[in-house]
Amino acid sequence: MIIRNKIDSLEKIIELKLNKFPEKLLKKGDINETLDFIKVYPAEFYAIRDKSKSCGNFKLKVPRDKVIEEISNYDLFTINVSSANYEENQLLVGEVEFFRNGDVYCCVSTNQKYSVRDACKNPDFNLKTNIFDKTLDDIPYFDDVYEYISRNELYDIIVEFALFDKNVGIYSENIIIYEIRTHY
């Protein structure tokens, strides 16, 4: 599997039916489509992410009444129901990669207020090891993440995720996949 950019990532997440928050890819001027999204998926907060480049600007906690103002800053963006609506339910967040040869990379945090980007900047656990390393047992809920990755055969792919203590997202599961990467 080759994922070259954020558009590829979103398409592959949809194709593989991975759990994610309701999300829509839009472009500058798509005000009516944005308002329709808010109506269909009512929430207190939305996340707005620049999808025109890697590591683009993102706002994790945009109040419902500020969304239209915020989207004017982007040429290509996604709007989604924000994980900020579930802060108190977040158990683990970050990115992981499980390799077919048994190697593991993980950069994760248990901080409930963290986004993936925050977790990678200030991780509680930042490891490059293998699946047999007992240190992985120290990471809360890591087995749940591994089980999801294995079940969906997401090997040799960097997976940005958050794990919750309740079911959320379009498929009502306790894990959300934000992005998957291979070649960017």
Enumerate the predicted regions with their spans:
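Nucleotide/phosphate-binding sheet-loop regions of phosphoryl- and nucleotidyl-transfer enzymes
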Residues: 1-184
